[in-house]
Amino acid sequence: MIADLKEKAADRHDWLTRAAGFSERLTAPALRRADDEHRAGKTRQAIKTIETAFKALPHSDYLEALSNLTDDNEGQFVSRIGKLAAASKNTDKSYLMMAQAGLDKRIWASASAALEKISPTARTNQFFLMTARLAEMRRVGDESFAAERDNALRQAAIAPRGPVWWCESCGASDEQWQVTCGSCDTFGQVGWGVSNDRQNLIPAQ
């Protein structure tokens, strides 16, 4: 990344801002920019950077960053993600991230409410896996949730696949972002989203 070659913080910040604006399919530029801001003592600005990026591209990387940057307790954190989801242009994906936050913080009511807000056409395998996870957590002491869990797992097996890191050049997917595609060695084409070979599996909205 060119920003790594810049010794001055201001120059590095400028390049990271440019990189963030280049493609909303990338999380690294916003994460790096927020890290620089946090190191410079500008934590509020770092939080704003991540929140802005989250509203454009809801991603678990941003959940982790916000969890580290804020002093929120469990309820406050899930509430923060809920407010961001309501303001996001990718509402369904944002509420999926809110559900993940609710599950991670063990706030079941918030996780359930977030999952209910996701439209039927956006219910990918990740949605059903989270539904199964929620049912499994609730099953402790109440076996009535076992059937709900099992049904969600069956649905996950046949549901459309959600977004992944994938290369626009060759279509290969990976578990994590890379500057250069591991399959075709093309630079700067790996981003987050639904790959071309999966787009036709997701019902039109």
Report each predicted region and the residues it spans.
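Repeat-based scaffolding regions
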Residues: M1-V179, S183, V190-Q199, A204-Q205
